[in-house]
């Protein structure tokens, strides 16, 4: 009996060793973290999936090394992704805890381990979409919820050494020096003034356009960097033309400028770059985002009042 069962156990172990991991990203930042995580598990096989509601040059750039890339704009594509990604996995990695498609993929798949990583500032914001009471829109059609993904993750890779995190402290693994730049800025004394975009409203684009246009003019910025999911166009500004997220685009700016002055409304860039040499990051005070800005202040980020000249 011992010799008869041995091949069965061996086959089972071989199957386990051949099981792949699924890692899902939905933003350029998530894609950058996903690639980092894949390198940590370099001996393991990954299926890398990129899902986005908006496809643009930046999304294309950061998804270029992914096995499957989906622009999910309708129900048919949603079902295609769900059917194609529902499999048996060793580990499933995700960042967007309340993404309906991720909830449904996890609910329908078989897996041994759930792992997660940061989606950005939302992970450490006590009044954010991952910390507030569960909303019906954060429940998948198979019953899996945002809170299930948060509570059931075994390990969470984070950028932030914060006293609050939506994932339990003992599960956190810190990504040290994640945004460290391997470049020496040019020595010419020049400063680039940059404004980062913000999606103020999901329903009314004119709110975002008015805010951004007003402050871009008041600050007389050299460059404007749109939000990753931005669909609107801002007139009378010079766009920083690059497929890179701003943290990576600094490499290009430092070829022409010795210093970079960054303005934002509530961007997590303020956390990522606050200790970067030759970079000054300033938040623009707006009552619209009072709570979020106060939390960023608590995290050590600076905010300033910008005179509009009205």
Residue ranges of each PLM-predicted region?
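Catalytic binding pocket for nucleotide-activated donors in carbohydrate/polymer assembly enzymes
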Residues: 269-310
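Active-site and donor-binding regions of nucleotide-sugar-utilizing enzymes
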Residues: 5, 22-143, 269-271
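Short, Lys/Arg-enriched N-terminal segments with co-localized hydrophobic residues
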Residues: 4-18
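Well-ordered, non-membrane alpha-helical segments in soluble/globular domains
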Residues: 35, 78-80, 99-108, 205-219, ...
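Short, hydrophobic beta-strand segments that form beta-sheet elements in well-ordered domains
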Residues: 23, 46-52, 92-95, 114-116, ...
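Donor nucleotide-activated moiety binding/catalytic core segment of transferases
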Residues: 75-82, 228-276, 292-293
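A nucleotide-sugar donor-handling region in carbohydrate enzymes
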Residues: 117-119, 124-192
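Conserved catalytic-core segment of nucleotide-activated headgroup transferases in glycan assembly
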Residues: 192-230
